[in-house]
Structure formats: C-alpha cells, structure tokens
Amino acid sequence: MPRHHQKNSGREASQRQLRVGESVRHAIAEILAQGGVHDPVLEGHLVTVPEVRMSPDLKLATIYVMPLGGRDTELVLKALDHNKKFLRGEVSRRVNLKFAPELRFRADDRFDEAERIEKLLRTPAVQRDLQHDSDESE
C-alpha cells in the first residue's frame, strides 16, 4: 500500500491536519477578536485560541480556548458551545474546505499544568533529590 494512503495512527498530526488546524485557529480567533459573535458572555471576555487539533478526516476541530485572566472558563465554554452553529458557518466561509468541520470547544489547561509542575519542582523533597543527583554526577 502506498505510504500516502495509510491511515494516520493518531500518534502525530499530519502536515495537512496542522495546516488546516492553524487556518481554523486564525478564523476563530479573528471572529472572537472582532466581536463577531453577539453573545453577552463572549462580548465581556477576551478569549485566546492557542491551539486547534483536527481529526484525520478534517471533519472535527477540537478548539482549545482560554479566557484572558483564566476567569469564567466554564461560562465561556458554554457560550461558545451555544454559538457553535454560527461559528461553524463563519469558519466555512473563511477556510476553504470540502466540509465545514464540527467544532468542539475545550479549556486550554496547559498553563495550569505548567504551574503545577513548577510547584512540584520547588518542593523540598524534589529539590533534595535534584541536589543529590547533581552531587553524584560530579
């Protein structure tokens, strides 16, 4: 079977998935920044769109969002979900695809996870282990 016909095993996104995901990310970010969605919750929040992951068939876009300041995340996710149909139509007009992808909104928790790891690395037990490892390597 030729290589370009093999299914993506889900381990790594294809170049096409990455390219389309970035186009969808730009479209959603632009719509939100311009106030294109008439929703009181979204009008009251600045929402960042750090990442969009596309399914291998490009029919599903998982959009990771984060309200600036990290407040009211659940409220913003509900508002985006409520306006999903409008946003999907806008994405289909702005991004040239055979099918408009279904949109799925998720909270981007990478900053929370990074903060948790930073706190863990600063704990006395981990500091002691790190110091012990560096002493052994000398």
Curated annotation (Swiss-Prot):
Key words, A-Z: Cytoplasm, Ribosome biogenesis
Gene Ontology CC annotations of this record: cytosol
Claim: ATP-binding is one of the keywords in the record: no
Main location: cytoplasm
Location of the protein in the cell: Cytoplasm
One BP term from GO: maturation of SSU-rRNA
Recorded GO MF terms: ribosomal small subunit binding
Keyword Transmembrane helix: no
Pfam families tied to this protein: RBFA
Quaternary context: Monomer. Binds 30S ribosomal subunits, but not 50S ribosomal subunits or 70S ribosomes.
NCBIfam families: PRK00521.2-5, rbfA
HAMAP family xref list: RbfA
Family, per entry: Belongs to the RbfA family.
The protein's role, per its UniProt record: One of several proteins that assist in the late maturation steps of the functional core of the 30S ribosomal subunit. Associates with free 30S ribosomal subunits (but not with 30S subunits that are part of 70S ribosomes or polysomes). Required for efficient processing of 16S rRNA. May interact with the 5'-terminal helix region of 16S rRNA.
Protein name from the UniProt record: Ribosome-binding factor A
Organism annotation: Rhodopseudomonas palustris (strain BisA53)
